[in-house]
């Protein structure tokens, strides 16, 4: 994760993030809202409403507290801009 503005350890921020091919973040939540814009590859997302394949130029908004899974496309992974309303966290859900 390369932070472009703000401070990911203490508050709101925007960062470029890369998921390698087949990356699996597991089922988790974030305390704060997240907004993601995919630059390259595909960001894979799944929540109780279903699955999404978010491609270049596409946008997804994930409300804080939403239980979800995310990962990278099997061939290219994903390069995306991630903006969070507060500090970065990833809270695993068992």
Over which residues does each language-model region extend?
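A short glycine-rich, His/Asp/Glu-containing loop-to-beta-strand
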Residues: 1-26
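Ligand-binding loop in jelly-roll beta-barrel domains
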Residues: 64-89
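Extracytoplasmic
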Residues: 10-14, 31-33, 75
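Short, charged, solvent-exposed linker or helix-capping segments at domain edges/interfaces
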Residues: 91-94
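Glycine- and acidic-residue-biased ligand/ion/polar-headgroup-sensing regions
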Residues: 20-23, 30-49
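Short acidic-glycine-tyrosine-enriched beta hairpin
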Residues: 7-9, 43, 47-67
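Conserved hydrophobic/aromatic beta-strand scaffold that supports enzyme active sites
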Residues: 3, 14-18, 35, 51, ...
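Short beta-strand His + acidic residue motifs that chelate non-heme Fe in jelly-roll/DSBH
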Residues: 25-27, 45-46, 67-74
